[in-house]
From Swiss-Prot:
GO cellular component, one term: plasma membrane
Keywords: Cell adhesion, Cell junction, Cell membrane, Glycoprotein, Membrane, Proteoglycan, Secreted, Signal, Transmembrane, Transmembrane helix
Protein name: CD99 antigen-like protein 2
Tissue: Detected in cerebrospinal fluid (at protein level). Expressed in many tissues, with low expression in thymus.
Topology relative to the membrane: Single-pass type I membrane protein
Residue ranges with Basic and acidic residues bias: 125-136, 159-168
GO terms under biological process: cell adhesion; diapedesis; positive regulation of neutrophil extravasation; positive regulation of T cell extravasation
Cytoplasmic side of membrane: 207-262
Natural source organism: Homo sapiens
Length: 262
């Protein structure tokens, strides 16, 4: 209760102070209304405002519609109106329909190659390149290769280009030793394979002989060891036999002496 009373007294004192300040008419204090009201009724030279309206070049705005006209979606596109729309029936306006036809662009074909030394795949589809009765028909240009040449190659013959044609480039048929290029490589591969097989056979034979020799030495040592043990056993047993025979002989009483004969 004490807190509520103190708060109420503070609010009351603040309200009284505000009323006293307004009644005193002190214009020197800070007031937000001073920023809104004009402090002087005399306008200064710089208070004049100049308004400039700039119209879009080449564009005329359509006249305003009379009141009572219906809703027209064309009003949203007034900026694109050039002022040439005709009034429609019932106060409404219609758009002028414009039909635009777009033609397909004409493509220009590249001119045919007039050089006779260049290779052209289109020559294979030209019937004029085929031979007729052993004679070649005149060609428009390109190469001198035709279906007849393919038939000659498949039939076991060799390709013979036309004389006087071609750019004189180097071919594989010009070098008689071109077919021998692959033979040295093949011979080298076969020779290396045979050498590796021979080396493997020799090494395996040597290892087999070494193992055989080692086993033979081991068997000889075992035989000598067995023989040595047998000899030692014989030597150890013979003295015992002799000793036993001597011992038996000494155990017998000596025979009585024979009487002397006269």
């Amino acid at each position: 209760m004490v807190a509520w009373r103190s708060a109420f007294l503070v609010c009351l004192a603040f309200s009284l102070a505000t009323l006293v300040q307004r009644g005193s008419g002190d214009f020197d204090d800070f007031n937000l209304e001073d920023a809104v009201k004009e402090t002087s009724s005399v306008k200064q030279p710089w208070d004049h405002t100049t308004t400039t309206t700039t119209n879009r070049p080449g564009t005329t705005r359509a006249p305003a519609k009379p009141p009572g006209s219906g809703l027209d979606l064309a009003d949203a596109l007034d900026d694109q109106d050039d002022g040439r729309r005709k009034p429609g029936i019932g106060g409404r306006e219609r758009w002028n329909h414009v039909t635009t036809t777009t033609k397909r662009p004409v493509t220009t074909r590249a001119p045919a190659n007039t050089l006779g030394n260049d290779f052209d795949l289109a020559d294979a589809l030209d019937d004029r390149n085929d031979r007729d009765d052993g004679r070649r028909k005149p060609i428009a240009g390109g190469g001198g290769f035709s279906d007849k040449d393919l038939e000659d190659i498949v039939g076991g013959g060799e390709y013979k280009p036309d004389k006087g044609k071609g750019d004189g480039r180097y071919g594989s048929n010009d070098d008689p030793g071109s077919g021998m290029v692959a033979e040295p490589g093949t011979i080298a591969g076969v020779a290396s394979a045979l050498a590796m097989a021979l080396i493997g056979a020799v090494s395996s034979y040597i290892s087999y002989q070494q193992k055989k020799f080692c086993f033979s030495i081991q068997q000889g040592l075992n035989a000598d060891y067995v023989k040595g043990e047998n000899l030692e056993a014989v030597v150890c047993e013979e003295p015992q036999v002799k000793y036993s025979t001597l011992h038996t002989q000494s155990a017998e009483p000596p025979p009585p002496p024979e009487p002397a004969r006269i």
